[in-house]
């Protein structure tokens, strides 16, 4: 959902290594697995301030810079196909299922979703060059906007909430066809509701 929201906005989207696979934080269970000096120092500080080892590790799992330094997960083999040697830092345990090889074989994967987002930016001039018009909504968890270039228009609606939300009436003005969504759907136009963290990208139909 976040990728859909960012890639349909103005500007140049940035993809950090592994984001396009849904790579996760490291999930280390022992401080010896960390390499970042600030993380290991902060771990000791937290212990001195009364945190348990489990509490300190939980905090590092959310905040440590090492979460963004784990090797690229190419496949489910040894060291995720990154190296035949010993990597500088260990991999998350989920690399056997979250990796390039597995996601290239699955058209419903996060990797395929990112590829389609990039393709839409190339195929639709309104996304790459158009203006942006935000749509007012009564729900702060709904982000909706139009990208407009001449007669071309792209509508993007995103639910940042953990519950199903109604699509604002202002998004239903005009006829649209669905370009991309992060849920499987038979709907062809603007839906009445968005599921939790659902994102839909639609193109205005020409008359």
Regions found by a protein language model. Give the residues of each.
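General secondary-structure edge motif
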Residues: 52, 97-98, 177-180, 184
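Short, surface-exposed beta-strand/loop "edge" segments at domain boundaries and coil↔beta transitions
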Residues: 152-153, 184-187
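Ordered hydrophobic segments in well-structured contexts
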Residues: 142-144, 154-158, 177, 198-203
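Active-site donor-binding loop signature of nucleotide-sugar glycosyltransferases
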Residues: 74-77, 181, 204
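Loop/helix patches that line or flank the sugar-binding groove of alpha-linked glycan CAZymes
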Residues: 1-154, 160-165
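A short, polar/charged loop/turn motif at coil->beta-strand junctions and beta-hairpin connectors
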Residues: 66, 139, 172-173, 196
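Beta-strand-rich binding/interaction modules
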Residues: 164-182
């Amino acid at each position: 959902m976040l990728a859909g929201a960012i890639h349909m906005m103005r500007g140049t989207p940035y993809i950090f290594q592994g984001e396009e696979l849904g790579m996760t934080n490291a999930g280390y269970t022992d401080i010896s697995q960390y390499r970042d000096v600030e993380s290991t120092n902060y771990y000791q500080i937290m212990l001195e301030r009364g945190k348990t080892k489990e509490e300190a590790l939980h905090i590092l799992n959310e905040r440590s810079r090492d979460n963004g330094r784990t090797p690229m997960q190419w496949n489910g083999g040894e060291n995720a196909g990154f190296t035949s040697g010993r990597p500088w830092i260990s991999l998350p345990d989920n690399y056997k299922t979250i990796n390039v090889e597995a996601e290239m074989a699955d058209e419903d994967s996060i990797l395929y979703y990112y590829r389609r987002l990039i393709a839409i930016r190339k195929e639709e001039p309104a996304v790459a060059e158009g203006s942006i018009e935000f749509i007012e909504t009564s729900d702060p968890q709904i982000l909706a906007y139009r990208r407009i270039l001449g007669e071309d228009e792209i509508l993007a609606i995103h639910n940042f909430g953990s519950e199903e939300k109604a699509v604002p009436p202002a998004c239903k003005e005009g006829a649209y066809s669905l370009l991309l969504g992060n849920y499987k759907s038979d709907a062809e136009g603007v839906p009445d509701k968005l599921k939790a963290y659902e994102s839909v990208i639609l193109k205005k139909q020409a008359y």
